C-alpha cells in the first residue's frame, strides 16, 4: 500500500471517528455503505470499531441498523474485538442493554461464550455488573445453542478463578446470585467449593458482607424504617425466572408509587436479606465438614501460591506461626464471627457442630473473635449454645488473653470518637460487664502473658478515654451551671414581683390579680421555672464538686445527672418565657398586645421546638442505662478486601475510549 493510500485510509478513519464521537450516526451509516474497508477498522486508542462505539452510546436503534446492514460481513464485524478482547456483545452485556444483546446475540449466538483478556464472557459480565435481565436472556440464548454441555464450567469462570457466583455476591447483586443458584443447580456444589486464586469461596464472600443480612443491616436503623421493613412481605425464590417471564419484564416498565417516597429502597433491602439467607442455606447444604475447616495461607507474589492447611486436634499444630508476609484467609465461620453475621454462625454450628473448636493463626476460636470484634449478637448465640463446653469459653489466644481480656480492650482509637461523645464510656463499661457476667467464674482474675488481668487492661486502656470524658463533663457542667444560675436568678426575681402587686389591705399579702386566669399561668410557670432551674443548678454543681478519677466514678450517674440537668435547664427556660409572656398580658393594652402576639408565637415555637429536638440527647444516657447492652463503637475492616484486589488484578475498563 502506497503512502497516499495510507494517508487516505487515515483520513477516512479520522472522519469516521469524529462522526461517531459526535453522535452523527446517519453519517457513520452512510460511510459504512460507501466504504467497505472501514467497517472493521479500529478507530480509537483502545482499538474499538464503530460497532463498539455504537453499543457504548446506548442507542439500540443505531446498533440494530449497523448489524442489519453488515449481514454479509456479520462474522467479521460482530466478532471484532478491542485491545481488551471485548466484542460489542461484551459491552452490551456490561451495560445491561437487553435490546442490543438480543440483536447481536441472535445474529451470532457463539459470541455468548467468547472470552475477553480476563477470561470473561458476555454472560459473565452481565452477572458481574448486576444486569439481571441481560444475564437471564444470555443464559437462555446459550443453553438453547447446539452442542452445549451441562457440565461445562469454563464459561462461568474467569482467569483468576472467580465464578459468576463469586462476582454476584461480592458486588452485592443478590437478585442475580439467587438466579445463578437456581439456574445451575448441578453446578452449585462445584461453585461453592471453587476457590479463586486468592483462596476465596462464595461462602467466604458472603460471610464478609454483613450488610446483606438482616441482623447487621437493621442495627442502628430508625424505628420508622424497621416498621416499614416489617410491613413488606418477601417470599423466598423457589425457581429461576423463566424465559417467558424475562420477555414479559422486557416489554413492560412499571414504576410503583412507593419508589418515589423511599419505600422501594426498603423493599429492595428486604429482598436482598431474604435472598442472601436463601443463598447461604443452599451453599451450606452442599458444603462438607472438610470444606468448612480449611484455612488458606498464601504468600503474596506475582503468581499466588496457595497451600491448604486442615486444622488438627493438636493445638500446637493449629496454632503454628505462619511465615512472615503470609496472608491468612480464615474459615467462613471465623469471618462470620468477626463481621457479626449471626445467621451464618447459627447455621454452620447447626450443620457442622465440630467446627466450634476451630482456631485461627492467632489461637482464637469464635468466642474470642466475637469478644475481640465486639459482636454482641454472635456472643449471645454462643452463650446460648448448650453444646458448648466451659473449655471453649476458657480458651486463650497466643498472648494468653481470654474473652474477658479482649473485651476489656478499648478497641477503637480516641481520635475516631466524636468529641464529647458521652455514651462511649458508658457503653464500654456495660460491654465489659456483659461479657464478665456471661463467662465462667474466675476468668476476671486470670493473667495473660503480660501478667495483666482483665480489670488491669480495662483500667489501662480506658484511662485516657475516662480522663477525656471527665474533663469534657466538668467543662460542660461548669458552663451549664452558669446559665442555670442566671435562669434561677431571673425566675426568683419574677416569682417575687408578681404583676399588679400585692393586696396589703388585709395584711395577708395576696396577689391582687390572683383570680385572673392568665395570672394562674404566670403563677404555675414562674414556679416551674424556679423549681427546674434550682434542680438543674444542683445537678451541675454536684458534677463539678465530684473530682474522682476512678473507673467506678464513670460507672453510674455522672452523665445521667448532666443530661437531666440540661433537660431541666431547658424546661425552666420554656417556663420562664411563658411566665414572661403572661406578665406582659397585664402590662400591654389590647392594641399593643395584638401587634406583639406574632412575635411571642414565633419565639415560643422556636424555644419549644429546640427543647423537643434535643430530647434524644438529654434522655439518651438514661435510656442507654436501662436498655439492652449495645456494643461500643469499634473501627473494623472487612476480613476480605475483595473488590479492590479484583480491580487491581483485572484492570479492566470496558467503557474506556479515546
Language-model features, listed with the residues they occupy:
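Alpha-helical transmembrane segments of multi-pass membrane proteins
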Residues: 480-491, 522, 526-533, 561-582, ...
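Acidic, Ser/Thr- and Pro/Gly-rich low-complexity regulatory segments
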Residues: 1-485, 496-518, 540-554, 558, ...
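Inner-leaflet juxtamembrane helices
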Residues: 526-529, 533, 537-547
